[in-house]
Swiss-Prot record:
The gene is En1. SUPFAM superfamilies: Formin homology 2 domain (FH2 domain) (SSF101447), Homeodomain-like (SSF46689). GO terms for cellular component: nucleus. This is Homeobox protein engrailed-1. One of its GO terms (molecular function) is DNA-binding transcription repressor activity, RNA polymerase II-specific. The keyword DNA-binding applies. Residues 138-147, 234-243 have a biased composition (Gly residues).
Amino acid sequence: MEEQQPEPKSQRDSGLGAVAAAAPSGLSLSLSPGASGSSGSDGDSVPVSPQPAPPSPPAAPCLPPLAHHPHLPPHPPPPPPPPPPPPQHLAAPAHQPQPAAQLHRTTNFFIDNILRPDFGCKKEQPLPQLLVASAAAGGGAAAGGGSRVERDRGQTGAGRDPVHSLGTRASGAASLLCAPDANCGPPDGSQPATAVSAGASKAGNPAAAAAAAAAAAAAAVAAAAAAASKPSDSGGGSGGNAGSPGAQGAKFPEHNPAILLMGSANGGPVVKTDSQQPLVWPAWVYCTRYSDRPSSGPRTRKLKKKKNEKEDKRPRTAFTAEQLQRLKAEFQANRYITEQRRQTLAQELSLNESQIKIWFQNKRAKIKKATGIKNGLALHLMAQGLYNHSTTTVQDKDESE
């Protein structure tokens, strides 16, 4: 019996190594002794997220320690006690946004996005949130068998109760966004991830210690991402100077950047804060004129001011008897006065050249109107409809008034 006892150990170690080599990288952490028992007992739990688990971080490899366990008995050990709830908070935000994203799945050119007021605005929050979610997903994949059971239970519970999932996501995002020096723990007062790792290492469980180390690495990545996104997220919630974004998310879940991301990026209801700017309409709204849209201004034509005809009209010239006598004499001599003669006459009579020119025009018009003889060319044009003025011709040039 003493010679045959190492043989099952070697066979079991070789079998575990073969299974570890055949298993994908995302599922290699569930081969610990504690995970085998727990996964066998909870075989009906299925992850909710359709995405494959991301690869574990290189800082916490768990495959080499599996081959050296001479003190373990051949029979399967009892399952370890479940760990405290902080790993659930770390792993929950990585998979919580998926059901909501599937419910509100929209494309870039969907009509709801075009008709929304914030169409065309740049969204700077999704990138840090996705980085935090990926880091949390890596930490969740690196968790041990007990944390996997808790994560599956949290996912199934969140799938059945959407209101509870919203609160869990808010608290988990708040714990992820907590800065290293902010000293803000989980909302329920449980110990942080560093304390969990210390307790696991003292207990002597290698799988739990590796999972806690991976969770600490994921928390460091999340803290770096939160520090990078702190300037953009500081003005999003009410009271940006009150503390860190994580503390604000824990105290006010409705102002959490993760919830704002779910509302604005996936087509859900947009959460409005108290210090929000006035609503800005997109440019296409002003291209069409309807009663239910704001107008860019009146489309009426400006009314022209009525001109005062008495002020703009040239005053009537009152000629003296001497001026009229000289003008009539010049008109009898020549009905069309020359420019040189008009200049000399204006100097002699103390009149303007325009006044003399207008008097000659009026004199010719009066004579033409007084006589009833029509112009032959004018009559011909009037017959064709090309001329509509009544014209007269003066035969006697010597005729006076």
